[in-house]
Each structure stands twice: as structure tokens, then as C-alpha cells.
Amino acid sequence: MKKHSILLATALSCLMSVGTFAQETKKDTVSYWKKATSMGATFNQASFNDSWAATQGSKGSVGLNLFYNTKGEYNKDKVNWVNDLQLQYGLLDNGSGMRKTIDRIFFDSKIGHKISKTWLVYGNVNVQSQFTKGYNYGAGAKDVNGNATDLLVSNLFAPGYITESVGLEWKPNTVFNMTFAPGAVRQTIVADKTINYDANGLAYGVDVKNGKSLRNEVAILQIVANYNKDIAKNVNLKLRYQLFANYQDLAAMDSRLDAKFTAKINKYLSTTFDFIAIYDQDQIARLQTAQNLGVGLLYSF
């Protein structure tokens, strides 16, 4: 775990350095930095299909979702450096106790060097995980009273994903970009070995049964596409798609789509709709989908 902690600390330090650099170089802050932060709380309705791995057995109800997003982008000469941190956590009570609706830790740091008007050579580190335990409700063995118990299926950095990539970025405008990274490397971490594993002893592709906590993968190609645009006054659409093609199993490419629709009602109120679709055979050999609709407070600066 020491190595895992070092990797995470290194990645998060990139974001912290944004603020430090901005404070120490006031002229660059004014001229070259563009920063945006939003935070808030929404009351929401959430639902899942039966395949959603992080909270299997939870159908959905009314709950509360908290979020914090901050992004800093530096542009000077041919250098483009983007740091993006997204934190989300939501709970609901559907009559069977408190359950999660959403739980996400996302950090991305990408630095690029322009080689033409629309193309850059870039390097990137991406970290993704969650905050708390997730369960497959009612799927465990029966207790002394004959009631089915819940299976622990996820936790903080169980799984956790750290991806390093170097490649080409196509950035034709300010609202869309796409990266191409042959040879991207991904580490899957399972820090909690008490989570449930399959008949082969694997949890998220990691051999937990035999005491392993880390799996390394190399992609023949990783593609990431981002779209972020105000499609109407006070209405924003944000999309992120990621494809990771492990060279050892091209028939089982991992795909993830994140979509977020935000409509501001006034300065502090907004409506948000989140949609996530995941296909990753190391999690579950079916398409996972989740959606979250909420109305609540939004503060941006």
C-alpha cells in the first residue's frame, strides 16, 4: 500500500500546485490561468439497473447529493496544463436503511505542448475511486435469523484506478478535445481485501484471494473525449467518454460514458441530471447504467 499512497499523493500534489503556482506568480494568474469552482447540494431521485456493480440491489428513491468540482487551466505560449477535481457523494433512504446513490473521486492532470494549431503532445495522470463502502444488498449468506446479509463489493480504493498516458491530443476548439494514447498504463487497486470476489478469486480483475492488491494493464490504445458547452443560456452539457483497450484482451474493451446536464434556475438554484454508463468485464459482464436527477443549491466562483 505504500506504493499506492505515493502514487496518489503525487497525483493530488499536481492539483495543489495549481493554487501554489497561482499565488507565487500573480502576473501569470491574471494572464494565463482560468479557474472555475462549483459546489452544492441537490435533492434527487435516483435509479439503477440490476447490473450496477457499486450498489447492486438498490433500485432508487429520494435522497441528497453533495458535490464539489474545481478546474484550473493554464495556457501560455505552446503549453496547456489542465487540472480537474470532481467529488460527489449521495445517499438515500428507500425504506431499507441509508444507501448510496453516487460516490465518486475523480482527479485528472494533463499537460500538453502544441505542435500545431489543433494538435498537442501530452502527458496525463488520472485517478478514480470512491469514498465509502458499497454493498450488494441481500446477496450474502443468511444470518442466524434466516435473513440474507449484504455483500461488501467496494470501498475506498477498492477499486481504485490510476492511469498514466502519453500521446496526441486533438483540440479543435474550446469545448471539445480528444486524446489518443497507445501504450497507456493502468493500475487497478483493491486496498480492502475483505470485499467479495468471484469464483476465480478475482475482484475487479485483481487476484484478491491470493493476497494481491494490484493489477497492471497496458492498453494498445486509450481514447478519451471531452465535451463541455453551454448549449443555451444558463444550460450546460458536459460529456466524457473513455475507452481502454487492453492489448491482452481486445474483445473486452472497457468503456465509460459520463454525462451531466445542468440548468441554472437562478444564481443559487439549479437542476442537474447525471447519467453514467459503464462496460467493464472485470466489474461485471453486463452494461451498468445509473441516472440521478436533482434540484438544489449551486454556488459557483
Where are these regions (language model features)?
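Transmembrane beta-strands of outer-membrane beta-barrel pores
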Residues: A41-S47, K76-K78, L87-D93, V125-K133, ...
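Surface-exposed strand-loop-strand hairpins of Gram-negative outer-membrane beta-barrel proteins
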Residues: Q45-N65, G95-M98
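Residue-level signature of outer-membrane beta-barrel architecture
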Residues: T70-Y74, H113, V125, W170, ...
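Outer-membrane beta-barrel "beta-signal"
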Residues: T289-F301
